[in-house]
Amino acid sequence: MREIVHLQTGQCGNQVGSAFWQTISGEHGLDASGIYTGDSDLQLERMNVYFNEAGGNKYVPRAVLIDLEPGTMDALRSGPNGALYRPDNFIYGQSSAGNNWAKGHYTEGAELVDQVIDVVRREAESCDCLQGFQVTHSLGGGTGSGMGTLLISKIREEFPDRMMATFSVMPSPKVSDTVVEPYNATLSVHQLVEHSDETFCLDNDALYDICIRTLKLSSPSYGDLNHLVSAVMSGITVSLRFPGQLNSDLRKLAVNMVPFPRLHFFMVGFAPLTSRSSSSFRTISVPELTQQMFDSRNMMTAANYQNGRFLTCSTLFRGKVAMKEVEDQMRNMQNKYSSYFVEWIPNNVQTALCSMPPKGLKMAATFVGNSTSVQELFNRVSNQFTAMFRRKAFLHWYTGEGMDEMEFTEAESNMNDLMSEYQQYQEATVSDGEGAYDAEEGEAYEQEE
């Protein structure tokens, strides 16, 4: 079976990750300690994508939990799902990265990384046919961003032909934890562009908006935000975990979603999002789901896709949905919003179906889009980065850990290149595409010579 090894690093990564495990262990009929209590064979059929069977009907998540300080781990271990994880898979330091990317990537994190790789190797060896890795982390802090990206590049070295998906929480415009977020995020994006195959961009700001506007929560907690993220994560992987008519795995998703290797930063959305109070007043239908899924306010990435164009997008419907109805709806959507799709990639919307709905819903849909408007997100970070870097503010925290200013300059220019690549494809048309393509091929040949 196509197994996935899950790594969660840093405080944010661990909290998002534990919400994810809570969601999918519920979907597979496991109780809080991993004992199977479900009633459907479908739940067991592909349990081993994410779980190892321990014996005695107990299933253990194939998760590696990593942090540079013990606090988050202790909280997880004593939390409601603490008994779910394998105790050897908690790996933590005692020092904390202190929101410093350099500590996570070069000093503190580097000391711990071999230990982590050993555990990852052990998890990978217990798989029949490892499909890839997924990492949950934030890009604003020190551990998730610095050590998270270090792990990604180490795993890349060791497993070069496996997929690497990351769920990355971007620093948001309004909610800032630390003043050095722009540095940490830029340095991380610099790594993700090179080493990740698919990065699902999440954003606290967008998540807050959804909680307040759509779910009508007056003061959302991180628990509420993580619940939204776990719904998307569960939706993206559902076709691996349950049988369906159209299955997609991480690799198929990447093949369909990534037209150019560097442009693998996706916007995600989920439907139905209804407040608990109003959910009983509406029936969920396929048109309703599609409508809500393409609503820019329901995107979990703080970038408005209407300012850019979709290179590709993928939708996953779950529940008792008629294939034909979904295809008709998707066709309508593409016609209605045709100006938001690039016309030089025909059939750029891919649909997958799965017969198993999430807990408590009759049907649901997950949206993943590769939109050029994701550059807004990078642009925001880049502007803050430039403002601080021009004055060399806070740089001594990084150089003190052995980093060089050159690295910052490289990361900055890589991010600017990424933005201009997105912009280039946003403006490309069918006719001028040919010329541009030849030019690029020509460059490639010259470099090879």
Swiss-Prot record:
Which GO terms fall under molecular function for this chain's record? Answer: GTP binding; GTPase activity; metal ion binding; structural constituent of cytoskeleton
Tell me yes or no: is Chloroplast among this UniProt entry's keywords. no
User: GO biological process: what's one of them?
Assistant: sporulation resulting in formation of a cellular spore
Q: Looking at the keywords, is Nucleotide-binding present?
A: yes
Q: Which GO terms describe its cellular component?
A: cytoplasm; microtubule; tubulin complex
Q: Where does Mg(2+) bind?
A: E69
**Matching Pfam families:** Tubulin, Tubulin_C
- Name the family: Belongs to the tubulin family.
Note in the entry: E.nidulans has two beta-tubulin genes: benA and tubC; tubC is expressed exclusively during the events of asexual sporulation (conidiation).
**What is the protein's given name?**
Tubulin beta-2 chain
Report the source organism. Emericella nidulans (strain FGSC A4 / ATCC 38163 / CBS 112.46 / NRRL 194 / M139) (Aspergillus nidulans)
Gene encoding it?
A: tubC
